[in-house]
Amino acid sequence: KFSKNFSALISSKKCVVAADTRPSGHIIVETVKAGLMESGIDVYDLGVVPTPITFRESRKYGAGLVVTSSHNPIEWNGLKMIIDGIGINNKQLDTVIKDQVTNKSKIGTEHYIKSDYINDAAKIIGKISGTPKVTVDVGGGAAKTVASELLKKIGCDVNTINDDLV
């Protein structure tokens, strides 16, 4: 229901979707994608990525939705809704909460994408001289998909720990 109502705010008819590593994330993402596509929104699935990457990508596509619950207990989950790189405001939240009539003339399409974040960040940072040895504790979070890869790309010898806690 919430993703269908959220679709009323998406003028671009495109939305990036992502999740953190919580066990319930996958099933919620699939439900969210179905609601968006049923409402005519083309969905671009980033998979598991940190929330800021979804905010960044939402500026390209017009909207974003992250399934996450940040620092709450692991059994909790929620939806962060984004329009043009900014979390929705109270007026937009009212639209999401109230039932909306959505355009069902076309079904949206589903795409699996990868953000250019790592390449873009590596260009800004540049190569590190030498090959420093770095251990990264990602704590089982969504950074597990980017932290080690970025450090390797800029020239570090990376040892990743705690990448699969959930």
Give the predicted meaning of each segment.
Residues K1, V29, T51, T68, ...:
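Short, electropositive, low-hydrophobicity segments enriched in small/polar residues
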Residues K1-A34, E38-G40, G108-V134, A142:
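An N-terminal, well-structured beta->alpha segment
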Residues K4, K14-W76, E149-V166:
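N-terminal small/polar loop signature for handling phosphorylated ligands or for N-terminal nucleophile
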Residues E75-V166:
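Gly/Ser/Thr-enriched, mixed-charge loops and adjacent short helices
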